[in-house]
């Protein structure tokens, strides 16, 4: 199976519009949560690159993948590609804790996002990505 990656075009159009359409199509708490996560990522790293990978999964990158934004029936999952290498003083990581590389945050309906802690985690990921 061929993997198709779509990166932001220079005018800021295609990928942003596709991610926005995905958010709108969800039309429930998952769309609202994904939209909020997306906004926080952009606040934490204004230079972030948005991509779509793996059959339409939003991916945010800066010198490497920061995280993905997957949606499931009962959760919005943010998977950090290098999460195991990050400090998580606020304890945001609550999924994929046993692996040697990735860590994830599962956000369920009604849960509050610790916005400051999430932005700090995004910035730490960018620092890690740019230091390699």
List the model feature ranges, each with a label.
Residues 1-132:
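Charge-dense, helix-prone N-terminal extensions
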């Amino acid at each position: 199976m061929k993997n198709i990656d779509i990166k932001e075009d220079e005018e800021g159009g295609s990928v942003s519009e596709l991610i926005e359409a995905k958010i709108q199509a969800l039309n429930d708490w998952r769309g609202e949560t994904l939209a909020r996560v997306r906004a926080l990522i952009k606040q934490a790293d204004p230079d972030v690159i948005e991509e779509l990978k793996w059959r339409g999964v939003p991916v945010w990158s800066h010198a490497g993948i920061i995280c993905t934004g997957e949606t499931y029936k009962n959760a919005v999952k943010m998977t950090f590609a290098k999460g195991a290498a990050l400090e998580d003083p606020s304890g945001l990581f609550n999924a994929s804790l046993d692996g040697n590389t990735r860590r994830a945050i599962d956000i369920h309906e009604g849960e509050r996002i610790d916005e400051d802690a999430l932005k700090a985690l995004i910035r730490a990921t960018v620092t890690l990505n740019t230091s390699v």
